[in-house]
C-alpha cells in the first residue's frame, strides 16, 4: 500500500526557531514530529528566493540546473509531484495565488489558491486558510494522495493572531507567530491517519538577520 503524503512548507521559517534549545516559541506539535520522526539539522536552502529554493526541493537539483525562478517557472523540468501522479497519486494543493505556485500546481487533481499579492485582502491561517485545509482533510481525500501546502504567515510583514501575541508564546512577534503555526499543525495532524501518512515539513529559506519584525499598518483578516 502506498503511503499518503502531507507536505507542508512555510515561507521564511528559520531553523533555530524550531529545534534550537534557546527557542522561546511554544511548539508541542513540532516537538512531537521531531521526536517521532527524522529532523535534518544540516538541510541548507539553495537560495534566499522562494521559487529558486523550492524548485530545488521539488526536483533535487540546483537552481542553475532547473531554470526555475520565482517569476519564470520551467515546465520542462520534472518535479516529484509529476512523478507521483504518474504512479497513481491524487495531487492536492493549497497555495498562494503567485505565478510560480499556480504554474507548479496547474495539473494537480484539485487546487485551492488564496489571495496573497493584495495584502489588504490577504487571508492567513487564522483568517480562513486553516479552516479550509481542515475541511479538505475531513473530506477523506482519494488515496493515495499528496497534499502540498505553502503558507505565507511568517513572511514579513506578518500579522500575529491576537490570542498568540502574548509573551508566553515567545519573546518576539516572530516567535509568537511560530507558536500560532504550531497550533494549526496540531489541528491538521488530528485529521490525518499517521499510520499511513508521511508528514513532511520544510521551509523555502530562512529570514533576515536580524528578523525584519515590522508590524503591518492594517490587520483586516485576523482575530
Q: Where do the protein language model's features map onto the residues?
A:
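Catalytic domains that recognize anionic headgroups
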Residues: 1-223
Amino acid at each position: 500500500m502506498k503511503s499518503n503524503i502531507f507536505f507542508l512548507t512555510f515561507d521564511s521559517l528559520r531553523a533555530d526557531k524550531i529545534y534550537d534549545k534557546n527557542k522561546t516559541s511554544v511548539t508541542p506539535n513540532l516537538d512531537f514530529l521531531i521526536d517521532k520522526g527524522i529532523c535534518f539539522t544540516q538541510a541548507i536552502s539553495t537560495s534566499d528566493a522562494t521559487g529558486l529554493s523550492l524548485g530545488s526541493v521539488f526536483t533535487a537539483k540546483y537552481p542553475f540546473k532547473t531554470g526555475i525562478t520565482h517569476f519564470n517557472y520551467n515546465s520542462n523540468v520534472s518535479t516529484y509531484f509529476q512523478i507521483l501522479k504518474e504512479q497513481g497519486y491524487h495531487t492536492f494543493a493549497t497555495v498562494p495565488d503567485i505565478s510560480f505556485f499556480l504554474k507548479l500546481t496547474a495539473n494537480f487533481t484539485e487546487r485551492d489558491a488564496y489571495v496573497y499579492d493584495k495584502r489588504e485582502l490577504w487571508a492567513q491561517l487564522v483568517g480562513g486558510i486553516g479552516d479550509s485545509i481542515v475541511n479538505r482533510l475531513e473530506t477523506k481525500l482519494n488515496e493515495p494522495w499528496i497534499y502540498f501546502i505553502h503558507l505565507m504567515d511568517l513572511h514579513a510583514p506578518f500579522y500575529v493572531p491576537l490570542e498568540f501575541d502574548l509573551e508566553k508564546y515567545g519573546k518576539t512577534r516572530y516567535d509568537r507567530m511560530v507558536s500560532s503555526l504550531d497550533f494549526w499543525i496540531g489541528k491538521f495532524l488530528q485529521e490525518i491517519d499517521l499510520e499511513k501518512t508521511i508528514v513532511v515539513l520544510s521551509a523555502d529559506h530562512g529570514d533576515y538577520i536580524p528578523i525584519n519584525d515590522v508590524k503591518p499598518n492594517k490587520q483586516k483578516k485576523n482575530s
